[in-house]
């Protein structure tokens, strides 16, 4: 177990003091990390302080404290407090001894080298061995520092050595360190009815200070402690009021933008040494030319493999909203325009308004879109162009090209990426092949589209409902946690696992929570945010941690502490989500849209820019706002209506008006505006009945079934908005709403326009449409009759050996543009461009006798002992797109032995299709969908029923090296772990397709639909 789990940061260097749940410590410097431990010698004996019978340990925003009791203390008590020094690399301990009998106790302090001298990620949790900071069994550099504790004792760590201090010297240093800690921690102060949230302000500020190196925001405070131009750490500067730090960061990376390398080399510019998976690092290519922002500050000659421009620019645009500094807008205008031109050149070269995503978000590793039209990157570019147009107007530049581009992007997103029948955005649309839409969206697709302001209120509500119903939720539980119903989320529902594709990552969870707040769904946002707070900050191994990966992540477990990405997002979700502070200093206003749970009767927040306090007493809500912006902004309070009428609204005791804003989250949204003064008090008095909800639960209805909703007394409805087309017909009366339901099975939403008292609002109605299609009356492979099996001979159509699949070069068709794409060997991705897998069918071939292989299920297949043994199809030019095999006679089942490739980018979409043709001209189709009935030949899917789910029963797979058949080949072959799960030799898949035995068969067509994959048939047996 890793005992060194809570780091304390002081100066803005890599130094940190590692603390534990018991008083044992480590001091990290890159060249000379140390282990520090203490013993206490008393008249009752000597005890190591990390072994006392009683230890109460606390972490308080940059300070670690302990309260110790032990039998040898004979009633005495030892308390310890430790801090990192604020102005140099070092730490200080304060020991207070009380009620010890006899002579004063003696503290025995020891410092030595650490056990693991070769740290991979600076000794971070989950990345380096758990015992890295323990003392060696035989220390070679042991230093001891004994001292008597006469009331209070101070120990100083300086230059990686321990020494005692005089009481006066110790008090001075300790007070100085405590004052610095307190100043940082108190810049964000939060008070709510939820005690789990009241610690967040100071803890967040300390973590944010830990990723500041004096010039830029870092990728992480511990592991990955390095500068990066992108990802979400830099949001924290403005949100937490460090506008000076924010500007320093933005200036440092503005100086890293390429300005003197024109694009002289055309698309595509792929790296042949890396099997065309990613762009070649060569100056003058579209990617490495003017506008590109390099990874390190003040260096515009250093290539990196991510597009970090998008996130950097988004953070910069938020900086303008926080400060309203038009002089700085003018200074940075060339940076923005070069960026926008660079994005267009690289990622929308066909000028269709939708952008490819080239490693432009944290979850980029293993993501590749092959020049596709991607929601999250298009959304980023929409907001950037829309905001650029607004900025241009303010500084006298031409806004037209940026406004036109923004309008073009939004129109294309709504026409091509929004799924009206499903109510969410697609992940992407293929550029190549059939240009199909990949509907199974990741959470980053939803939250980026909402965060970048591409959604109207109806879209935002529907899209967050997709997260409710389609994204895996993992319960957050703990012994003693009284409150139930908390759950964190996976980033996708994709298989197979690959790093950053399906993880439980704190920044992703919190950004999703932010999207709930932005969609008006405060209760859901609060519940998800609290689930993440409980998971990472209270139940995890590191108290107060803003870590990268959750304990609930099946692949990595709890990993990396105080990581830049979650610190930046936590800053936003807390300040901009829960407290709803949304400045627009460019337009001299600040929106306050609180996201408090309905049962909160008070809450307050204080930042360097603004404070506000909310109180509720019976029917009166009061908001007291204090601004500290350079020029006070006009507050615009946006709140959900509580009741059907408003008795009064007052601003600074003067009657004021309110307006209604269109919303779709289930409550009337009201807006109250005030003048820009340093202090504002807004009071709302409600009256009348509480607002009624038409459908609090989600009714389950059959397609073509009927829905009846009672309209409560005092309410009425006048309109219906049915964006998902689930209402075949409906009637609205004074007391009831009745509808006949149509549409695809699954979760759906429509909206009704509701009136009650003074309030008018759109109210969502969620329904679940049952699948009433006749379920198959069989279980696959449950009716095998070997004596009736007839093997099909299609030897002449066999065009490959199954072992060829990853031995080929798949060179065409390829995108004409620079992109991230599948490597030429047909497996891997841009982070693993040289990955391959050895397919070995020797065992299977050895079991073939007289062209027949007998499976353990009793089904025979015609296979070849030598030569070609599979008919491959693919959209790659290596094989035909489709192939038809002649059939005759009648049969009730077609048993297929198949093998081929797939990957996470082709999950939950038909990779291929099998069509059975009958002599009468009719046909039936079976789609091959990863992971339902199609799996990658080289690996076993990790399934845990949580983040990784597949329908039951799992398909039978056939081990090519041994001939074994199993629905759980991983268990059969003792495959462990989550990532890779290589099947030695590979495995095929068995399908049972029920047929209409009253019809004469004509043929079977296999067609590949997905661009990446190769799909083959090895054997067909009719029964």
Each predicted region: which residue ranges?
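An extended acidic
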Residues: 1-68, 163-188, 193, 342, ...
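Acidic, contiguous internal or C-terminal segments within carbohydrate-active enzymes
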Residues: 70-115, 610-616, 629-631, 877-895, ...
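Acidic/polar, glycine-enriched structural segments that form the non-catalytic walls/loops
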Residues: 73-79, 84-224, 243, 255-261, ...
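Catalytic cores of carbohydrate-active enzymes
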Residues: 264-269, 348-363, 370-376, 380-468, ...
